[in-house]
């Protein structure tokens, strides 16, 4: 059976709060790292979230 193209990733807050979101991405179509402005409930603001590999 073939291996799937989607990889699970973790989007971690750059505010240093330790908050993160998990999602998946297609590693063939988006080989670069993702960055999103998302809501961090710890600091109650929108901050930059960067992709790190999910262990």
Curated annotation (Swiss-Prot):
GO BP annotations listed: translation
Domain of life of the native organism: Bacteria
Keyword Glycoprotein: no
Keyword Ribosomal protein: yes
GO CC terms: cytosolic large ribosomal subunit
Pfam families: Ribosomal_L33 (PF00471)
Keyword terms of this UniProt record: Ribonucleoprotein, Ribosomal protein
PROSITE patterns referenced in this protein's UniProt entry, alphabetically: RIBOSOMAL_L33 (PS00582)
Signal peptide segment: none
GO molecular function, one term: structural constituent of ribosome
Record field: transmembrane: none
Record PANTHER family: 54S RIBOSOMAL PROTEIN L39, MITOCHONDRIAL, LARGE RIBOSOMAL SUBUNIT PROTEIN BL33M
Protein family (similarity comment): Belongs to the bacterial ribosomal protein bL33 family.
This protein's name: Large ribosomal subunit protein bL33
Organism: Aromatoleum aromaticum (strain DSM 19018 / LMG 30748 / EbN1) (Azoarcus sp. (strain EbN1))
């Amino acid at each position: 059976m073939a291996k799937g193209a989607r990889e699970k990733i973790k989007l971690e807050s750059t505010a240093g709060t330790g908050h993160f979101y998990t999602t998946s991405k297609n590693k063939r179509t988006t080989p670069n790292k993702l960055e999103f402005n998302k809501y961090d409930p710890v600091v109650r603001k929108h901050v930059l979230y960067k992709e790190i590999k999910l262990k």
